[in-house]
């Protein structure tokens, strides 16, 4: 008989805690709805549209870029003479330089945001950088380096670039 009373006591405590938690969650959600509706009213009392504002687009060239880019610089892509590095490096773009690229011609012209140009010592380190950065789009010359199968999990889109001119055109278009 005393065992049954102990179980009833535990059940009463569990029920009280559950009711308290449910009441707290209801109160919190109800108070957030009130604050949101008060926030969405203009001074004249009319309600505003509940629209999610899009992040401002990144300006690059003449058009806008909404994505973050990771560009792997290989031997075919290392001659980027006409690129405006000061403008490009202000955007959400990271350049990873392959270990086989010895003469990256524009490395002396870059004055700001040099942390966005990463010289990789090994291909394993290069792919570790790509996985860690998790950029929306990866630009790579597949003729110079083999892309691992799992990289698609870390980048939304993988684009094949054949030459440095095509890369410059791509950066100007986006």
Swiss-Prot record:
Pfam family, one: Peroxin-22
Swiss-Prot/TrEMBL GO biological process terms: protein import into peroxisome matrix, receptor recycling
Alphabetical list of Gene3D superfamilies matching this protein: Peroxisome assembly protein 22
Record keyword Transmembrane present: yes
Cellular location(s): Peroxisome membrane
Keywords tagged on the record: Membrane, Peroxisome, Peroxisome biogenesis, Transmembrane, Transmembrane helix
Entry's transmembrane regions: 9-27
Membrane topology: Single-pass membrane protein
Protein name per Swiss-Prot or TrEMBL: Peroxisome assembly protein 22
Organism: Candida glabrata (strain ATCC 2001 / BCRC 20586 / JCM 3761 / NBRC 0622 / NRRL Y-65 / CBS 138) (Yeast)
């Amino acid at each position: 008989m005393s065992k049954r009373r102990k179980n009833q006591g535990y059940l009463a405590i569990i029920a009280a805690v559950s009711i308290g938690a449910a009441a707290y969650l209801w109160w919190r959600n109800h108070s957030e709805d009130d604050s949101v509706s008060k926030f969405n009213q203009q001074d004249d009392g009319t309600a505003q549209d509940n629209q999610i504002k899009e992040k401002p687009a990144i300006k690059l060239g003449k058009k806008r870029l909404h994505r973050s880019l990771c560009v792997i610089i290989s031997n075919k892509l290392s001659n980027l003479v006409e690129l405006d590095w000061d403008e490009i490096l202000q955007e959400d773009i990271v350049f990873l330089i392959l270990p086989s690229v010895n003469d990256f011609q524009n490395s002396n012209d870059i004055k700001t945001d040099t942390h966005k140009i990463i010289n990789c010592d090994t291909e394993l380190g290069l792919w570790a950088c790509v996985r860690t950065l998790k950029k929306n789009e990866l630009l790579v010359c597949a003729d110079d380096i083999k892309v691992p199968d799992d990289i698609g999990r870390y980048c939304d889109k993988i684009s094949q670039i054949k030459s440095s001119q095509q890369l410059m055109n791509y950066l100007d278009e986006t």
